[in-house]
Amino acid sequence: MSYRESSGSFPAPDRTSLPKMFTNGDSRLRHLPPISSPPPPKRYKSESTPGSDAGHSRYYSHSVASDRTRSRQPSSAMDLYTLIDRDPVDKDPRRNARFTSNGSVATQASHASNASQISRSSPIIISDRKIPEKYPNHKENGRMYHGYRKGIYPLPCDEEEQDRLDIFHKLFTVARAEDGLIYAPHPPGSRILDLGCGTGIWSIEVANKFPGSFVVGVDLAPIQPTNTPKNCDFYAPFDFEAPWTMGEDSWDIIHMQMGCGSVASWPSLYRRVFQHLKPGGWFEQVEIDFRPRVEDKDGEPGRAMANWYSTLKHATEATMRPLAHSSNETIRNLQEAGFTEIDHQIVGLPMNPWHPDSHEQKVARWYNLAISESVQPMCLAPFSRVLSWTREQIDRIAFDVKQEAFDKRIKTYNLLHIYQARKPVEE
């Protein structure tokens, strides 16, 4: 294993704690540029930023674009197409719908027009595919939650939550170097599975960027768009912890983003992912470690932020779906599942724009917006269900955490972890 170290202000991890089980991969921490260094060159196609006022997300200006391709009404926050730049050809709202609202399973014949361009080694049969009306959403603490497999996922599925997920998607595309959508190698005509696809924004972006590929997104909540690219389908409600019937050895890429807090057994999930990948296929996982860290050696995270995280960690552990993320455990579990060529990247996410570097300020503005929209919904169900907190108690701690997140004197950051793991090629 090799560890690439560069000059920067983020502290390097303890070498003794770094995993030593890589077959052909490496772990590298992407540091913030030194304070004295000039800003890095522009690396991203999308230069839209949520306002130029660095420090408080409530001052960010949001444009609301009408988008007829979405299954939900335009909201007061960000719209699908204002969050991510798209080619003009992909903005046509007249695409044929690929997601059927009555829950019927798409058949092999429904994709016949794409058969010459997209390789499908086996049919897709989703055993968990049900009629959404059988599982009505339920209201709890003023928010709407999924009805299918009620209670196993701690976050809402309403308009506010959908906007929050889209904001995180934009954050990841900005924070990740070069190609912000996917790092794992993928051949032309790849079959790509997106686990816990949420609003479907990642699946749609990948389908548009790689029109020769075939992308399938699955999720507990049927909140995906009704009109999608022809090479993209969604199946919901679907519980990826339940048995799959989606064809073993049949996917080139399986992707998962922000799964912590929704998985009871990571070893079991990784084994299932391994079974369904083609030999030589790749699994890519993106997670945030929400444990607050500080830039200054002698500094400490804000008390409210530290208390919020430790309490949330305890509450989610009690539900058997912990939010806390461990890179060492993740890499060990991937190896034990059979993966090789494991690669691990670590990216710093400043909580607010305290760093003078222009790119890091851009990342920080998006993360400040994302975290300010996340503090309350992330703890609402765990604190009320597990700890019996009142709504007033939850709102108070959420308010205090947001105040600390907006304070540039507290140089707090979290870590974004990106993994790629390969299923060995059969000899």
From Swiss-Prot:
Subcellular location: Nucleus
Regulation: induction: Expression is negatively regulated by velA. Expression is stimulated by the polyamines 1,3-diaminopropane (1,3-DAP) and spermidine.
Record's catalysed reaction(s): L-methionyl-[protein] + S-adenosyl-L-methionine = S-methyl-L-methionyl-[protein] + S-adenosyl-L-homocysteine
Stretches with biased composition (Polar residues): 98-115
Entries under Gene3D superfamilies matching the protein: Vaccinia Virus protein VP39 (3.40.50.150)
Main location: nucleus
Biased composition, class Low complexity, residue ranges: 116-126
Basic and acidic residues bias locations: 84-95
Enzyme Commission number(s) of this protein: 2.1.1.-
GO CC annotation terms, alphabetical: nucleus
Knockout-associated phenotype: Leads to pigmentation and sporulation defects. Drastically reduces expression of the penicillin biosynthetic genes pcbAB, pcbC and penDE. Leads to a severe impairment in conidiophore formation under both light and dark conditions. Decreases the expression of the class V chitinase chiB1. Decreases the expression of the transcription factor atfA.
Record carries keyword Transcription: yes
Cytoplasm listed as a keyword: no
Entry-linked InterPro entries: SAM-dependent_MTases_sf
Chain intervals for the UniProt region annotation (Disordered): 1-126
Record note on quaternary structure: Component of the heterotrimeric velvet complex composed of laeA, veA and velB; VeA acting as a bridging protein between laeA and velB. Interacts with velA.
Function text: Methyltransferase that performs automethylation. No other methyl-accepting substrate has been identified yet. Component of the velvet transcription factor complex that acts as a global regulator for secondary metabolite gene expression. Controls the expression of the penicillin gene cluster. Controls benzylpenicillin production, but is not involved in the biosynthesis of the alkaloid roquefortine C. Positively controls the expression of the class V chitinase chiB1. Positively controls the expression of the transcription factor atfA. Also regulates asexual differentiation.
Protein name as catalogued: Secondary metabolism regulator laeA
Organism, scientific name: Penicillium rubens (strain ATCC 28089 / DSM 1075 / NRRL 1951 / Wisconsin 54-1255) (Penicillium chrysogenum)
Organism lineage string: Eukaryota, Fungi, Dikarya, Ascomycota, Pezizomycotina
